[in-house]
A protein has these predicted regions:
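Surface-exposed, non-catalytic interaction/assembly patches
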Residues: 250-277
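Intein-associated homing endonuclease modules of the LAGLIDADG/DOD-type, together
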Residues: 3-7, 12-243, 268-303
């Protein structure tokens, strides 16, 4: 498993037992269930103020607050009216090993979301130079360019992406890309974002990816969460597609304007804790320095 810093740690003990349990509701609608011994590493209002004031000139040393669920249920979750008191910071990027990939991650991500048909791509003027340079930097030759005034530019490359992926042309993101190193996954996400440049909303400094394919949008959500970003996923019933929204301080496209990362990307607030029926529980211990491990789809830190 992985700890809050994204490092792989070895599980040293697993025990099964039944216990009275609680369900913790988070601000992005995710939930975590566990018994009273489940621990969280939490931010308080004072911690968040100090994190906001931190300029990154020296190491941030303020510790997170360790609280068990049995203690949390007796504490107020709100203060000063309706403000939420406790929050769980997102984890750091998961540290997977570097992968030897058939197509560079940026190029694959761009191909995956942009291709009109075999070896035909379209690109807007806003990120034309950046994307073309990326292809050239990775050894591709731009073989055909059709510029249309006021519209997207159509281009082809050699060698073709399809020829490098033979014998299997994937219709979803292969696992070796999703389990690649941090730098490779950021490049993959950058390629996906640059494939359709209107996916970045500059006024709000956030990204929005839309798809009608459930498996595809879940893969991209897992990719984004694995580099330490919190996501929000919605289904628009009246137009039949899924929308994935998130913020990232990693530079994913040329026109992005985001502040640098100083401590972590973002956080989830605890909104409610409710009693639930007795359930089968699993006690886990690891050999990590702080005993933390990540759970659920959002890679949420527990202990």
């Amino acid at each position: 498993v992985f700890d809050q810093n994204g490092n792989p740690v070895r599980v040293t003990l697993v025990q099964h037992f039944e216990s009275n349990c609680y369900k913790v509701h988070l601000s992005d609608l995710m939930t975590i269930s566990g018994n009273g011994a489940l621990n969280f590493l939490l931010e308080t209002p004072k911690y968040r103020i100090r994190a906001l004031e931190h300029k990154g000139k020296r190491e941030f040393k303020r510790p997170l607050v360790l609280l068990a669920l049995s203690e949390l249920i007796n504490k107020p979750l709100k203060y000063k009216g309706n403000k939420l008191f406790f929050s769980i910071p997102t984890c750091k990027p998961l540290k997977f090993p570097h992968q030897d990939l058939p197509v560079p991650p940026f190029i694959f991500g761009f191909w995956f979301k942009n291709r009109l048909r075999a070896n035909i791509f379209s690109i807007k003027d806003l990120n034309y130079k950046e994307v073309i340079q990326k292809f050239k930097d990775h050894g591709y030759e731009i073989t055909k360019t059709v510029k249309r005034k006021g519209r997207a530019t159509i281009f082809s490359v050699y060698p073709t992406i399809e020829s490098q992926l033979i014998p299997f042309i994937p219709n979803q993101i292969p696992n070796n890309y999703l389990l690649a190193s941090e730098e490779q996954r950021i490049e993959l996400l950058s390629g996906i974002i640059n494939a359709k440049i209107n996916q970045y909303k500059k006024p709000r400094d956030h990204f929005r990816i839309a798809s009608t394919n459930w498996n595809e949008i879940r893969q991209i959500q897992s990719l984004v969460e694995s580099i330490g970003c919190k996501t929000s996923l919605h289904y628009r019933d009246y137009i039949k597609y899924y929308t994935l929204s998130f913020k990232s301080r990693y530079k994913l496209c040329e026109n992005q304007e985001s502040p640098p990362i100083r401590i972590h990307q973002t956080r989830r607030y605890i909104t409610e804790i409710e009693n639930i029926a007795t359930q089968q529980c699993v006690h886990i211990e690891t050999d990590g320095p702080d005993g933390s491990f990540l759970v659920n789809e959002g890679f949420i830190t527990c202990r």
